[in-house]
Each structure stands twice: as C-alpha cells, then as structure tokens.
Amino acid sequence: MTPEKYRPTITPDLPNRQWPNQRLTQAPIWASVDLRDGNQALANPMTVEQKLKLWDQLVAIGFKTIEIGFPAASQLEFDFARRLIEENRIPDDVTVQVLVQAREHLIKRTYEALQGVKQAVVHVYNTTSTVQREKVFCKSKADIKAMAIQGAKWVQSYAKEHPESDWVFQYSPESFSQTETDYAVEVCQAVMDVWQPTPDNRCILNLPATVESTSPNRFADQVEYFITHLKNRESAIISIHTHNDRGCAVAAAELSLLAGADRVEGTLLGNGERTGNMDIVTLAMNLYSEGIDPELNLSDPDSWVPVIEEVTKIDTHVRHPWVGEAVYTAYSGSHQDAIRKCLMRQKDDEPWNVAYLPIDPKDLNRSYEAIIRVNSQSGKAGAAFVLTQEYDLNLPKWVQQDFAPVAQTIAEQAGGIVSHQMLYDAFIQHYRLDKSLAELNNYQLSRKEGKEHLSVEVNGETWQGQGNGTLSALCDAWQRRTGQQVDVLDYSEHALHEGKDSKAIAYVYVQQKNTKTIGIAMAEDTVSAMIQALLSTIR
C-alpha cells in the first residue's frame, strides 16, 4: 500500500463552528431516493411492477417526498412516472421528486413525464467538483456556474408551461463534498438568483457527499460554512445527500443536521452506489432512541424488510443496525445476565433503561423470547431467561447456578444454539421431573400451638412430623422415620401461569450430612409441590 498517493480533502477553516453545541429535537424532512439512486446501483434494475411495489411500501412507511426516478433517462423511468400519475397512485400529501441533468432536452422530457401531477420537486444538478471540472468536463469555474444558471432557467421556464401543477425547484452541486465550499456557495447563490425563492416559496439546495471523502465532522463544517455564507438562507431548504464510502454516511447526515440542514435524502437499509446511500432506517431509529419521533412508521420490519430485499435482491445483514435479525440477541453470559435483571426491574411507566438494549425490541415487533439465545458462550442467565420467558419457570439463583453446567454441556455438544425445547427437556430430565421416585398419596396439614402438624402418606406409608412450616414438618417426619437429619437451606415456589387452574412449582435446596441437593416438583397446589420437591431430594 502507498498512502503517499493520497491527499486529504480541503475543507473550510471554521474556528467558531456552532454545530458541536447543538442537539437534535425533531426529525428532518425525509426524502426517499430508493427508486432512483438506489435503483441505479442494482445489477438488475427494478421493473415497473417492482417499482410500484416499492412505491406502495414507501408510502405506507410515511415518506412525504419520494424521488421516483430520472424520467428522461429511459422509457421505463418515463412510463413509471406516467403510471403513478395516470392511475392516481400519488396521495395528496405525497410529493414526487424527479432527477434531471442541466440539459434542455432532458428537462423538457421530464416535464412531459410529469404532466398532470399535482405537485412535484424537479431536481436539477450539475457537477462542481475540482476533479470533474478539470478532468471530466474540462471546464472552468465560470463555465460550470453558467451551466448551473442555464439549467435553473430551463427548469423555471418549462414549469411555467404547466401552471396546473405546484412545482418545487431543487438544485444540487454534485460532489459538493469535493467542491471548494466558497465556490459551491457562489454557484448555489447564482441559482437562487434565477429562481427568486421566498420564505413562503422556498427552493431546495441539496448538498451531496456524492463520494464520501472526509470525516463526518469536517463535512458538517462544510455544511455550516455553506449555510452561514448563503444569502437569503431563510428562502432555501438545505438538504443533505450522503454516501457511505468511508462508512460514515449516517454520522455525516446526523452532524449535518446539527450544522443546520433541514432535509435528508437516503434509502431504506442504505442501498446505493458503491458502499451505499445514507440509511434512513438507521438515522430515523437513532432519533427514536433519543425520544424523537422519526415521523416514519418503521415499527414492523418483518413486513417491509422483505419487500426491500425482494426488489433489490440484496439480503439484510443480521447485524444491520436496529433491524437485523441478531441485533437484539445476546449470547454472552454477562450480557444475558444484565439484560435479564434489567427487564425484571423495568416498569412500563418508566423511561426505557435496559443494559445492552438501546430500545425496547417490542417497538420493532421483536419478542423478548428472541433476545437471549443459549450457546457455549452463555452463562446461567441465558438458560434462566429462556426458561422464564418460554416456560414460566422463575428459577432461584441457586437453581440457575446448578443448571448452568448442564446447559453448557448441551450447547457444546450441539455446537451452536440450543433450542428452547432442548433446554426445557434437559431441565426436566436433570431434575427428574419426568419420574416419580416417591408417590404422594395424601397429606393432612394442621396448625396447633404455633406448630405445623403434617401427616403424609407416601407410597402407602404414613409419616408424621411437626415444625415451623410444611418443609420443616416433613423433615421432622423423615427424621422420625429414618433417624436421618435433613436441613432446608432455601426454597422457593410460584404458580406456573396466571389463573385458578394454574399448577404450582416448588424448588427446595437441602443438606443431608455433607451433601447438598436440589429438588423440584410440579403439582396441583403449592403444598403438594413443596412436599414432592423435598421428597425428591431425600428418597
């Protein structure tokens, strides 16, 4: 590798930058470019029918501005625009956006594609970066600026031929991120001089990181510099269009909003040229996780992610931020333990505050059952969580510790994730809940003189004992019968589910001589469960 081949992108000096001190308090104006920027990055571009399916999904999610394509680029793009308009598929509160280069015949064709539309954004652009000026177009700064001005005039002129529609004009200095910021301001100012926008009738100035060429903080500097040096800033909506070449498209967009941008263009799940466009899902959920309404309905990824995958033929990574299959799953034992404890303490009326889970998975229609999965990396908490969530077994800590090696052995033998059923079956087998070593035929329990008096019939034999409670009375009965002392170290019991027909489960931890044993039993009532659990340890 030869790093000396490269030079850093020059960005403006901004010693008094204000964006680091700002906080986001509301969602930006969203503009989906899935149907254009996303589509042009596909090896097999979408058909009209696929575009219509994606269009319906974008509308359902709540986008109010949707770039539908480059109608002058191909007949398919043109036909798609016509179908949306002629079949009345565009809701009254949704504005379509179209892309066009600053060339007259393309602009004319674009307006033909939009004839009869209620409202639309006409997005005209030309490149302004140094490398494009000098090596691609071989044009001077003055030439490029003149191209932008002429394009703006054509956009305005052809709009006047279609007064039945409401038009919004948008201009992009393509490769803004690699353009001298002063020059980008100069060109955009010249475009505004043509359009003469007002605070009540604003134009859109879109600032693309067509190729991400610097760190997010420096791109934010470019955006803040641009905004603070633009005349009539109140007459322009400042839009951001970032790409992910350095892996920072979302961060760059987020910091640009702090720098004063109003609007963000991107795609769902980040599909786009090279490494992709800015992922609107990630940015929207970032806002959501801080208590800001993203104004997009992303609550059921299992319904809309498959649509994106179907039309793009791109699978979503299991670790994709917020919506990947594995992002709310913990395998690490310490993580599982922290999650389990936090979920036990989390109250419905309190702000969400759970370790390792930045949002409540239920907000994205994910179940708690899928959060913790047991494998060889899991500790006692993972198995305990699964047994609690799936089978209503609230294991005491001493049962968790005792069962953990069993779960570990199963996971190592399985060589991967242990299914919930495998874990439950192992629990039943390990604590012999599938076998009755002692049959409880009957019992009588009474209280006299501050003591519990127990008469219990086991395998046809009657035992009697007394004590401070049921368990101590049974231990006394056992000692009277065998001469062996049994000490109850701990115990726990609970109903297996809500309702009058619920069974009970009891856990007892006992010591006989130097041996400690755990007994567990399920029964129709708590006392029966406690007796059978203790019997399972002393027989």
Curated annotation (Swiss-Prot):
Top EC group: transferase
Molecular function GO terms recorded: 2-isopropylmalate synthase activity; acetyl-CoA C-acetyltransferase activity; magnesium ion binding
Chief location: cytoplasm
Gene3D superfamilies xref list: 3.30.160.270, Aldolase class I
Localization in the cell: Cytoplasm
PROSITE patterns listed in its UniProt record: AIPM_HOMOCIT_SYNTH_1, AIPM_HOMOCIT_SYNTH_2, PYR_CT
Pathway: Amino-acid biosynthesis; L-leucine biosynthesis; L-leucine from 3-methyl-2-oxobutanoate: step 1/4
Pfam families the record matches: HMGL-like (PF00682), IPMS_D2 (PF22615), LeuA_dimer (PF08502)
Reactions accelerated catalytically: 3-methyl-2-oxobutanoate + acetyl-CoA + H2O = (2S)-2-isopropylmalate + CoA + H(+)
Domain Pyruvate carboxyltransferase positions: 28-302
GO cellular component, one term: cytoplasm
Tagged with keyword Transport: no
NCBIfam families: PRK03739.1 (NF002991)
Family, similarity comment: Belongs to the alpha-IPM synthase/homocitrate synthase family. LeuA type 2 subfamily.
Function: Catalyzes the condensation of the acetyl group of acetyl-CoA with 3-methyl-2-oxobutanoate (2-ketoisovalerate) to form 3-carboxy-3-hydroxy-4-methylpentanoate (2-isopropylmalate).
Subunit structure: Homodimer.
Record-given protein name: 2-isopropylmalate synthase
Species the sequence originates in: Hydrogenovibrio crunogenus (strain DSM 25203 / XCL-2)
Gene: leuA
